[in-house]
């Protein structure tokens, strides 16, 4: 039995769809809002639940009896988190703590999606060095702080867990989902609109299907700890935008790198 929390989100939906099409899994999707794709091909159960509601999430665990819980839910817009500290902490820390405690009670493996925003980005890009699972977090915004705090609480509470850090996850989004950098660039350029993108921020863009595949491996892998799932190319946001324009044969002159 697999419980996917945040199943209406971009990454969560991919994981739900993939797991629900495998015979060995009995998948339950959970989101704050009703199923975004109720007539999809996957075989799954869908529940509308607010994970910030302690009673509701306890009831969900009782009904789902999960062997593994995959938490893709988060308040993940950095600028919003900066001005809504209480809401961000409640979603990214307090609710995560509750999930961790329930996973211990039900002996569920807890797979929690986190972010590269736990780092400060000051690593020397000229050295060719990348952040590893052993790198020391040093968040510079409140979103990153809450995600790091959530990671720490999971490690303190859970005896069976995997923290999965991802970044710049891309792929095709469904209507109503938050977009990603690839879709954003395509939409703007197709509309003939200019787009400004940073050229001094290095990231490793990751295909959403690869994240799903990595999470599936971690369901069966009993190792505890932090795992980075990312693409194999490091590039700036501006370079990503230019790649999208070239691949889709769109007007790259509309892209303006900034620092």
Residue ranges of predicted features:
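N-terminal Rossmann NAD(P)H-binding glycine-rich loop of SDR-like oxidoreductase domains
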Residues: 2-22
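N-terminal Rossmann-fold cofactor-binding loop
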Residues: 29-38, 50-51, 73-74
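Mid/C-terminal beta-alpha module of Rossmann-like enzyme folds, strongest
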Residues: 214, 221-259
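NAD(P)H-binding glycine-rich loop region in Rossmannoid oxidoreductase-like domains
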Residues: 48-91
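NAD(P)-dependent short-chain dehydrogenase/reductase
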Residues: 152-203, 210, 216
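SDR active-site strand-loop-helix element
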Residues: 5, 30, 72-73, 110-116, ...
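Catalytic helix-loop patch of NAD(P)-dependent Rossmann-fold dehydrogenases
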Residues: 90, 94-98, 118-164, 168-170, ...
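NAD(P)-cofactor binding segment of oxidoreductase domains
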Residues: 69, 83-111
């Amino acid at each position: 039995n697999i419980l996917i929390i945040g199943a209406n989100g971009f990454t969560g939906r991919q994981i739900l769809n993939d797991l629900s099409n495998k015979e060995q899994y009995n998948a339950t999707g959970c989101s704050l809002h009703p199923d975004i794709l109720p007539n999809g091909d996957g075989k799954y159960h869908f529940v509308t639940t607010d994970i910030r509601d302690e009673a509701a999430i306890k009831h969900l665990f009782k009904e789902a009896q999960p062997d593994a819980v995959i938490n893709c839910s988060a308040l993940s817009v950095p600028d919003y988190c900066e001005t809504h500290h209480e809401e961000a902490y409640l979603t990214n820390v307090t609710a995560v703590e509750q999930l961790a405690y329930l996973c211990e009670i039900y002996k569920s493996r807890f797979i929690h999606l986190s972010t590269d925003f736990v780092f400060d980005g000051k690593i020397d890009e000229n050295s060719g060095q990348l952040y590893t699972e052993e790198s020391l977090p040093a968040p510079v915004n409140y979103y990153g702080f809450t995600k790091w705090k959530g990671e720490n609480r999971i490690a303190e509470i859970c005896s069976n867990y995997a923290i999965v850090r991802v970044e710049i996850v891309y792929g095709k989004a469904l209507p109503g989902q938050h977009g990603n950098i690839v879709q954003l660039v395509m939409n703007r350029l197709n509309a003939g609109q200019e787009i400004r993108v940073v050229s001094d921020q290095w990231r490793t863009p990751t295909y959403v299907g690869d994240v799903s595949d990595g999470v599936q491996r971690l369901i069966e892998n009993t190792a505890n700890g932090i795992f980075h799932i990312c693409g194999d190319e490091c590039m700036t946001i501006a370079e990503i935008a230019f790649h999208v324009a070239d691949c889709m044969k769109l007007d790259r002159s509309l892209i303006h790198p900034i620092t």
